[in-house]
């Protein structure tokens, strides 16, 4: 819908219809919406999406996408030798486009699988470089989109890339979101089993954001459960959240599934998670996502510590001190 009185400019009928069409396009992508009223923000957003769309393929060819690594800190040792691979877009003009601005457009235009594979290849290349240099490396997790996961050749494609770079088993972890897990449980179980047989580790991301099912943990052979950051935000239900978190961790520990807490930002959260035997932590309290060279410097430092005398990270110790001071 486009109201004539809302337009500051004098338009011909074609221009008016053009703006109504902009509004119509937003209805197609919205949930439970039957109409939309045009305003300038709609046109700006659609023009922005079009500009992203027009340069997506070329940007992939030009390798404008950078892989960043967000370390995961082991709460027992305090070492950060594992990480999650994330993507950033640095245009040829030097502009950094955050993932929330381009990933939804890649998904909408069915190009997200190409981006997934691009990141996966970059991670494999990083691991191979370290192995060839005789440097230690630990598990790196990569995110897989719904579209990628349901590709008929998904497992074979990723296995072929893994084999091309000669990556040993268990150094690559495939992250799938909880929402994917509930689309088709039978297909999920089959695909996860295939991935495991090819030497991949499997993690469920964003656990707790959807209709989590305990049968999923019982029937699907996952290795890692990532507890969503929504459990750790300040809320009036903090005590109940902590009870739920402890229950989840107790359960999955008994199932030999490792736990990662996401979005951790305070010493109080670290102390609590250490007290309930969470395995790893990821969040700004320790590290933001880092470019490859900075992550590699951390790896080299952490492994040097590990080879001499393993010691807890200073921030883990700070969290333990927080516990002593507040109890």
Which ranges hold each PLM region?
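Active-site core of bacterial EAL-family cyclic-dinucleotide phosphodiesterase domains
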Residues: 37-106, 143, 204, 261, ...
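Cyclic nucleotide signaling catalytic output domains
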Residues: 1-8, 12-30, 36-51, 55, ...
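Catalytic core of bacterial c-di-GMP phosphodiesterases, primarily the EAL and HD-GYP domains
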Residues: 3-7, 45, 75-84, 110-188, ...
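EAL-family c-di-GMP phosphodiesterase catalytic domain
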Residues: 75-76, 92-93, 145-152, 171-186, ...
């Amino acid at each position: 819908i486009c109201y004539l009185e809302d337009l500051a400019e004098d338009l011909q009928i074609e221009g008016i219809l053009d703006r109504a069409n902009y509004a119509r396009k937003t209805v197609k992508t919205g949930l439970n919406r039957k109409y939309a009223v045009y305003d300038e923000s709609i046109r700006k957003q659609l023009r922005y999406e079009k500009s992203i769309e027009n340069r997506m393929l070329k940007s992939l060819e030009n390798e404008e996408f950078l892989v960043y690594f967000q370390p995961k800190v082991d709460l027992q040792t305090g070492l950060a030798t594992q990480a999650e691979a994330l993507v950033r877009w640095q245009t040829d003009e030097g502009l950094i486009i955050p993932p929330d601005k381009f990933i939804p457009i890649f998904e909408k235009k069915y190009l997200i699988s190409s981006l997934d594979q691009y990141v996966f290849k970059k991670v494999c290349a990083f691991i191979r470089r370290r192995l060839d240099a005789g440097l230690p490396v630990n598990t790196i997790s990569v995110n897989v989109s719904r579209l990628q996961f349901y590709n008929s050749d998904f497992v074979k494609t990723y296995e072929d890339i893994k084999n091309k770079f000669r990556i040993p088993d268990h150094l690559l972890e495939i992250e799938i979101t909880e929402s994917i897990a509930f689309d088709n449980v039978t297909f999920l179980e089959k695909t996860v089993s295939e991935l495991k047989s090819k030497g991949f580790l499997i993690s469920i991301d964003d656990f707790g954001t959807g209709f989590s099912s305990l049968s999923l943990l019982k029937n699907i052979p996952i290795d890692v459960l990532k507890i969503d950051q929504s459990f750790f935000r300040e809320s009036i239900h903090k005590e109940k959240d902590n009870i739920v978190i402890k229950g989840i961790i107790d359960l999955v520990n008994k199932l030999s599934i490792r736990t990662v807490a996401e979005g951790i930002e305070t010493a109080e959260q670290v102390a609590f998670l250490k007290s309930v035997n969470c395995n790893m932590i990821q969040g700004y309290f320790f590290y933001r996502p880092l470019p490859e060279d900075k992550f590699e410097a951390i790896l080299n430092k952490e492994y040097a510590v590990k080879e001499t005398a393993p010691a807890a990270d200073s921030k883990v110790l700070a969290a333990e001190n927080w516990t002593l001071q507040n109890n």
